[in-house]
Amino acid sequence: MARASSSAAAAFLCALATLVAAASGARLAVRAGGTGLTVRAGGGASATAVFALGSFWRSEAAFGCLHGVLRTSVGYAGGSKPNPEYRNLADHAECVKVEYDPRQIQYKQLLDVFWASHDPREVFGQGPDVGNQYRSVIFTNGTLEARLAALMKEREQVKDRSSVITTKIQPLGAFYPAEPEHQKFELKRKPFLVQLIGNLPEEELLSSTLAAKLNAYAAELCPPKTQKRISSKIDEIAKKGWPILRDI
C-alpha cells in the first residue's frame, strides 16, 4: 500500500514538472494564437493571468511585489452580465489581472501565491467578505494552464481531505476593469506614497510596475527583506526633500 502511494505521488510530481516546463518554456509557441500573450513595445513577450480570491483590494497587492510581474489591475470576470459595476456585479467575481514576463516568473509561481493568499476551502466568501463575488476561481488561458491549475488544486486537496477545495477552474471570458477608485487600493490608502511617485494620473498608475510594487508594500505583502529595503529607500528619499521615487 505504501509503495502504491509512493508511486502515485511520484507520478503526480512528474506530471506537475512536465506541465510547469510546458507552461513556461513552450508558452510562446502554444499561446501565440490568442488569449494570454502580448508583445511589449521593446519586443519582449508578456502574459496575463487572472485570479479571483476574495476582495480584489488586497488580492491585487498579493502579486505586486513578485519579481517578473509587470503590472496589476482589478476587475470583474466569470459572470454573464455585460459591463458589471462594483455595486451591480450580478454573477461576476472580483478578480485581479496580473501581467508578467514569463521569462522571469512562471505561471506556477503565480499559482503558488494564489493558493497562499486566501483560504480556498471557504464557501461563499473569504473571511469577513461574504458573497458569491468573493468566490475562489482560477481563470485560465488555454489547455496548459487549465491542466496545471487542476494538478495544483489536487496538490492542495491532498494536504487535507477533511474539507473540500472550493476553487473553480474555468476559461477566461471577458475581463471588465473595475472603477478607478478600486485600482491600487492599498497604495491609495497611503497618500504620501502616491505623492512620492509623482501623483501619477490613473492611467499611468494602472500601468506602472513601480505602483504595483508599492501597492504590495503598502499592504505589507512584500517579503520581509523587500519591505525593509523599500522602507530604507523611502527614508533616504524623504531626507533628500521628497524627490520623486523612480525605482525600488
Over which residues does each language-model region extend?
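Flexible coil/turn and secondary-structure edge motifs
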Residues: 2-248
